[in-house]
C-alpha cells in the first residue's frame, strides 16, 4: 500500500482498504507480506489479525526508505542460524556479493549500450569498469572490496543518467532527501525490494543487520539486494522513464524534496511487484543457510 491517507481495517478473514473513495477487500489467507509505504491509518486489531495469521508487515517512509517490520513469533525464535551467521569467516561472502554486484551492473550497461547505442559511454569507461571487476580477486581486505564496489555503483548511476531525459535533473544516485523524480523512483523500488529481502532474511532466522560486505541495520539485506537492483528494479525504472509515462504532473519538486504523486506510485507498485522475484530471494536465503551450515558453497543467484 503506497501513497497517503488510506484507512485500513479488518475482520477475522479480510482486510479492508479505503483510499480516495475506493474500497478494496483482501482475504487475509491470500497474504504473506503486507507492505505499508507512506502515511496511512491502520487499526491495531488489523495488525493483530495479520500477525496471528503469519503475515509479515513492513513499514517504509513515503520515499521507500525502510523503517521496520512486525513479524510473527516464529520468525525469530531460532538462534542457531544467527550464531552461524556471526561466526562465519566473512571474506568469501563479501567477495561473492561484491563480485555479483559489480558484474550485474557491467552486464546492464553493456545491454543498454547494445540497445540504445555505444554513445552512452565515454571512451574507455567500460574498460575501467571491467578492470575494477578483475581487481577484486587480488584484494585481501573487505574494506577494499567495499570501496571498489561503491566506485562501480557510482559510475553505473552516472551512466544511467545519460539514458533518460535531462529534464528530470538526474546526474547520480544521492542520499535522502531526493530532489529529482529519478532518485525518488529508484528509492521507491529499492524500498519494495528491501522489504521483500528483509522478510526472507527474517523468515530464515537470520539477522538482517549482520552483513559481510556492508555495514548498518540492513547490512545483510543490502549485501543481497545490491546484486539484484539492476535487473529487478533499475531496468524497469529506466524503461518506465524512457517510455514517457512520467509526466511533469506526476511529481512535485519542492525546495526540500521531490514527491511522487499517487497515480505514479500506484503504477510503480504494479511494475515492481511483478519484477521483484520473491521465489528467487527465498531460494537465495536457503543457499546462504546451507553455506553457513557447511552443506554448500555460497554464491549469488542471478535473476
Swiss-Prot record:
Keywords: Antiviral defense, DNA-binding, Endonuclease, Hydrolase, Magnesium, Manganese, Metal-binding, Nuclease. Mn(2+) binds at residue 149. The keyword Nuclease applies. GO terms for biological process: defense response to virus; maintenance of CRISPR repeat elements. InterPro entries: Cas1 (IPR050646), CRISPR-assoc_Cas1 (IPR002729), CRISPR-assoc_Cas1_C (IPR042206), CRISPR-assoc_Cas1_N (IPR042211). Transmembrane segments: none annotated. Its EC number is 3.1.-.-. Its cofactor is Mg(2+); Mn(2+). It holds the Pfam family Cas_Cas1. It is an enzyme of class 3 (hydrolase). GO terms for molecular function: DNA binding; endonuclease activity; metal ion binding. Belongs to the CRISPR-associated endonuclease Cas1 family. CRISPR (clustered regularly interspaced short palindromic repeat), is an adaptive immune system that provides protection against mobile genetic elements (viruses, transposable elements and conjugative plasmids). CRISPR clusters contain sequences complementary to antecedent mobile elements and target invading nucleic acids. CRISPR clusters are transcribed and processed into CRISPR RNA (crRNA). Acts as a dsDNA endonuclease. Involved in the integration of spacer DNA into the CRISPR cassette. Homodimer, forms a heterotetramer with a Cas2 homodimer. This is Putative CRISPR-associated endonuclease Cas1 2. It comes from Methanospirillum hungatei JF-1 (strain ATCC 27890 / DSM 864 / NBRC 100397 / JF-1).
Amino acid at each position: 500500500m503506497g501513497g497517503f491517507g488510506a484507512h485500513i481495517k479488518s475482520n477475522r478473514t479480510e482486510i479492508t482498504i479505503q483510499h480516495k473513495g475506493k474500497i478494496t477487500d483482501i482475504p487475509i489467507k491470500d497474504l504473506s507480506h503486507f507492505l505499508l509505504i507512506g502515511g496511512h491509518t491502520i487499526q491495531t486489531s488489523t495488525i493483530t489479525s495479520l500477525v496471528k495469521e503469519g503475515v509479515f508487515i513492513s513499514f517504509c517512509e513515503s520515499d521507500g526508505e525502510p523503517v521496520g517490520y512486525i513479524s510473527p513469533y516464529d520468525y525469530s525464535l531460532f538462534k542457531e542460524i544467527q550464531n552461524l551467521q556471526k561466526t562465519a569467516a566473512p571474506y568469501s561472502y563479501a567477495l561473492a556479493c561484491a563480485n555479483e554486484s559489480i558484474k550485474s551492473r557491467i552486464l546492464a550497461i553493456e545491454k543498454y549500450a547494445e540497445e540504445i547505442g555505444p554513445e552512452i559511454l565515454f571512451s574507455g569507461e567500460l574498460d575501467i569498469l571491467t578492470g575494477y571487476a578483475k581487481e577484486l580477486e587480488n584484494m585481501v581486505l573487505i574494506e577494499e572490496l567495499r570501496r571498489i564496489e561503491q566506485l562501480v555503483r557510482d559510475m553505473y548511476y552516472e551512466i544511467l543518467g545519460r539514458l533518460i531525459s535531462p529534464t528530470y535533473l538526474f546526474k547520480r544516485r544521492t542520499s535522502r532527501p531526493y530532489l529529482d523524480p529519478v532518485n525518488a523512483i529508484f528509492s521507491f523500488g529499492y524500498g519494495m525490494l528491501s522489504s521483500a529481502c528483509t522478510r526472507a532474511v527474517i523468515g530464515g532466522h537470520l539477522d538482517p543487520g549482520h552483513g559481510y560486505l556492508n555495514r548498518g541495520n540492513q547490512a545483510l539485506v543490502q549485501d543481497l539486494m545490491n546484486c539484484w537492483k539492476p535487473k529487478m528494479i533499475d531496468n524497469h525504472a529506466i524503461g518506465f522513464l524512457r517510455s514517457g509515462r512520467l509526466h511533469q504532473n506526476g511529481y512535485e519538486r519542492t525546495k526540500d524534496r521531490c514527491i511522487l504523486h499517487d497515480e505514479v506510485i500506484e503504477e510503480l507498485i504494479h511494475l515492481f511487484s511483478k519484477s521483484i522475484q520473491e521465489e528467487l530471494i527465498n531460494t537465495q536465503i536457503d543457499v546462504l543457510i546451507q553455506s553457513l551450515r557447511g552443506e554448500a558453497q555460497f554464491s549469488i543467484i542471478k535473476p
